[in-house]
């Protein structure tokens, strides 16, 4: 399974979302549609999930990560993660999103967050001084 995700940081905190009926928070993004690049998928998902417009030039690759897919047996998730350097609009949860949160080191342990972001992405953002 191939997904892309976006790193959006504001005031030293990372944006994470929780879908309706789910317990785990994740960074905005989602599965690639057929013939879509990871960058195109992320631009589409950001508009669908939080109503912001992003161009391909606004994205910088942060890294590619692999982990067992959440709630799927014998499925590996490949996730391309991008910095979202700029966007147009305001972050507003769509009807498929139950909750948006801005997390940093002071509150990240209070929520369930996706494995790749908890184990790989978030610690690197803290180490690089991008997230408090």
How should these model regions be labeled?
Residues 1-27:
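N-terminal strand-loop-strand
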Residues 25-29, 103-105:
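A short, polar/proline- and glycine-enriched secondary-structure boundary/capping micro-motif
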Residues 2, 65-90:
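Active-site-adjacent beta-strand/loop module that shapes the phosphate/pyrophosphate-binding cleft
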Residues 16, 81-83, 102:
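Conserved hydrophobic/aromatic beta-strand scaffold that supports enzyme active sites
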Residues 11-13, 85-90, 105-107:
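Short loop segments at secondary-structure junctions
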Residues 92-124:
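NUDIX/MutT-family hydrolases
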Residues 28-62:
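The catalytic Nudix box helix
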């Amino acid at each position: 399974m191939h997904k892309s995700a976006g790193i959006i940081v504001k005031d030293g905190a990372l944006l994470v979302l929780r879908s309706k009926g789910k317990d785990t928070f994740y960074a905005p993004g989602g599965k690639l549609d057929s013939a879509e690049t990871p960058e195109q998928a992320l631009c589409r998902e950001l508009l669908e999930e939080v109503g912001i417009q992003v161009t391909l030039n606004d994205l910088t690759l942060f890294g590619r990560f692999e982990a067992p897919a959440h709630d799927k047996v014998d499925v590996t998730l490949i996730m391309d993660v991008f910095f979202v350097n700029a966007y147009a609009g305001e972050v507003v949860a769509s009807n498929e999103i139950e909750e948006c949160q801005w997390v940093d080191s002071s509150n990240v342990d209070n929520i369930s967050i996706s494995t790749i972001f908890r184990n790989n992405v978030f610690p690197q953002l803290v180490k690089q001084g991008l997230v408090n």
